[in-house]
C-alpha cells in the first residue's frame, strides 16, 4: 500500500492486490507507482468469483470512507482471468489505514484467498508515476466498444442479495470475453456541496451510486464492417441490459457510455432532463448548439452512409423527433 503525502493538505493511501484463476499464463495489467504482493492464483473459478463478490461488497466501505476503488476483471483466454484491485483514501489517517483494509483481506481469507502481507508505504504526492489509475489500457478508448451502468446504494441492502446478482451478471459477461471494470466512488450531493442536487445538471443517479461499472470489448471495433459492429454492439448491449434490469431507477455516466444508449435522456440526465430541456430552449431557440445525445439534440442527427454511430458527417433534421416525451 502507498500513502501519498500532500504536504499541508491530504494523505492519499493506495492499496493494490491481484488474484487470478485459470490454466493459462498470466499477464498482469501494468501498475503506476503501486507496489503489491505477488498475485494469488486461485485454482477454482467459483472461488475466484466469490472473491470478486467480496470486493464488491467492500466497495461501499471504500465509498463511505471517502475513498476511490478500482476492481477490474480482465479475461486472458482459455478460462484465465486476472482481478486487480486498488483502493485510494484521501485525507484518511495514516495510522488507521491497516485497520481499514484488514476486514477486506480477512473476508478473502475466509473463502481461501490469502493475499500475502498487504502493507503500506509513504510516497510524495507529486512523485513521478504516482497516478491513481492502476491499469493501462492498450490503444485508445475511442476505438473500443464499451457500455456502462451506475450501481446504486440499494444494491448493498437486503444482505447483498441483489449485489450477488450483479456479480453473477458480471461473471457471465467476463466469460464471454469482455473486460469488466468497476470504479467505486461517491459523488453525493452532500459531498459535492453547492449547487447541490436541485440546480445542477449532474445525473441524480450519480448522487446515489457506489460503483460505476464499465464493460469493454477488448479488441478495437473501429475497423469492423457495419454488420459486424451492429452484431457486436447488440451482444454487449444484451449483457448490460441485465444490469439495467437489476437497477431500473439508476442510469449511466454520460462521459463513459454507449453512443447508442437507449432512453438516453433518462439514462444520462434522469429527472433533471425536463428542466434542462426548458433551459436549452430558452437560451438556444435556434438549436444552434448541438452534440450527440446531449440536452435538446433530438431534432438532429449525423447521417453516415454506413449507418455506424459517428459525429463526422452531415447534420440532418430528424423527420420524427420524439420531442413530446420531454416537452414541458
Label each residue range with its predicted role.
Residues 1-328:
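Soluble FAD-dependent oxygen oxidases
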